[in-house]
Amino acid sequence: LRLLADVKLPAIFTDNMVLQQRSDVKFWGEAAPGRTVRITTSWDGRSYETAADASGRWTTAVETPSAGGPYTVTISDGRPVELKNVLVGEVWICSGQSNMEMRVADRVTNMERELKEADGYRNIRLLHIDNSTSPAPLADAKVRHGGWQVCSAENVADFSATGYFFGKELHRNLDVPVGLIETCWGGTLAEAWTSGGALADIPYFRKRVEKVKTLPESTEARNRIFVEDMEAWRGEMALVDP
């Protein structure tokens, strides 16, 4: 979580971000228990109030207009802080394996021209999520480059090529701001991106989901168990096919 005065926000809420148009966008974070948190949006001057619960967590939703901007979003627990250069448009998650991970700078066709032209797409914004694992949904994420970035030759070079070209085509056709969130991991299985609840509905995965629930929270501890299980499996396979 990123410190904003006494208010803490997840790392995905930063300057230059894009919010989904014509929707109720959820904001959440932490503050002192019982503290009132007010969010004010510059597109309509409206304020939304909520209060932190006993554990300090708060959440509320704000209504967004049709595509436009730039705007500011002010979050205050008594000391206001602004998120600046905020756009409203279309937000897409770019997820997948290594084909989604391939960067624009990884020698895509006409790479030099594409990088040069990227400076002209400043209403495309980029958010790059770092890889991490968790057996349960997280309230925060690790992000690269401090959060959302304005599209430019420098910033897009390290971004997903598939994601960027999709976003550029969307921007050209709809003429609205586009926010692209890269969250991909080469070689991962579809099951790794699926909730435990959804997998438990499939008989084949039911026992496996129950096993995951018994694993320790520490990533390092889970990795040790994985290595031990893998070694045991290899030992069994060696007996079958030495």
Language-model region placement:
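Cell-envelope and extracellular/periplasmic
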Residues: 4-242
